[in-house]
Structures are given as C-alpha cells and as structure tokens.
C-alpha cells in the first residue's frame, strides 16, 4: 500500500513538473514577443526635445511681438494728451 501512495505522489510531482515546464515555455514565448521599447523611448525623447525647441521659439516670438513697455511718466503723459487735443 505504501508503494501505491509513493506512485501517486510521484505521478503528482511529474504532473506538476510538466505544468511548470509548460508555464516556463509560455513565459519565454511572451518575453520573446515583447516589443523593443528602447526605440519607442528614443523617438519620444526626440519629440519632447523638438517640442521644447518649438515652445522656446514661440515664446521668443511672443516676447518680440509683445515687448514690455515702460510706463510713461506723468508729465509726458499730460503733454501727449495736450498734443492730441490740440490736433483735434
């Protein structure tokens, strides 16, 4: 009777071993079929760099088209208003 139990245990171990082998093969297949993300990462990094360059250029254009003008001092502002009213 103890031999029968040992045979059953041995058969169970063999079945588990076969399942582990099948699972390992499936893992190997999945690993082999994973896409290479390094190329995709490199392309995304290049696009991010290009986007940063474009943003910088747009900001420079915006600064040129919309410069910060200093406030006109009070006495000059009055003179300009008087000139405008004299022209009318």
Swiss-Prot record:
<dbReference type="Pfam" id="PF05531">
    <property type="entry name" value="NPV_P10"/>
</dbReference>
<feature type="compositionally biased region" description="Low complexity">
    <location>
        <begin position="77"/>
        <end position="88"/>
    </location>
</feature>
<dbReference type="GO" id="GO:0039679">
    <property type="term" value="C:viral occlusion body"/>
</dbReference>
<comment type="function">
    <text>Seems to be involved in the morphogenesis of the polyhedra. Forms extensive fibrillar structures in both nucleus and cytoplasm. It is involved in the liberation of polyhedra from infected-insect cell.</text>
</comment>
<dbReference type="InterPro" id="IPR008702">
    <property type="entry name" value="NPV_P10"/>
</dbReference>
<feature type="region of interest" description="Disordered">
    <location>
        <begin position="65"/>
        <end position="88"/>
    </location>
</feature>
<keyword id="KW-0842">Viral occlusion body</keyword>
<comment type="similarity">
    <text>Belongs to the baculoviridae p10 family.</text>
</comment>
<protein>
    <recommendedName>
        <fullName>Protein p10</fullName>
    </recommendedName>
</protein>
<keyword id="KW-0426">Late protein</keyword>
